[in-house]
Amino acid sequence: MKALLLITAAIFIFGGCQNAATKKTDSGVPNVATDIKEVSPADAQIAVSKAYSQFIDVRTPEEYSSGHAARAVNIPLDTLTAKLDTLEKNEPVYLICQTGNRSKKAAGLLKEAGFNNVLNVTGGTTAWQTANLPMETLPPHGAPPAK
């Protein structure tokens, strides 16, 4: 009888853990799937410079214009869903933000939308800068580009 109670309790405990991993957050963004790959800034930089890949910075336009990883294109997290049709599902997609949190959310969105090869840059732009990897900046909105 005690064994039956222990087995029943274990089913409830482990069943609750499994559901928590698949629930969506309060914002409707899915929790990150376990199959999203993390990649170091150095490895991401090598990959995006050598082969066709999509490198997306999901920060706000203001954050992006103040300095971003070289070759990264700005698609803010809050507009990503609307722009999924501009991305190639079967090509690698590297995602970066400031510290890695928003890019993890973006990775979850892409995986849910059927993207096959989604990679999150560990530590985001902060780690990219710490590793002294190439950065680019944009002039302030409305300012002419530097010559």
Label each PLM-derived region with a short phrase:
Residues 96:
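Short, surface-exposed ligand- or partner-binding patches at beta-edge/loop junctions that are enriched
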Residues 55-57:
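Structural scaffold elements adjacent to functional motifs in cytosolic proteins
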Residues 2-6, 12-50, 62-91, 103-147:
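Rhodanese-like catalytic fold shared by cysteine-dependent sulfurtransferases
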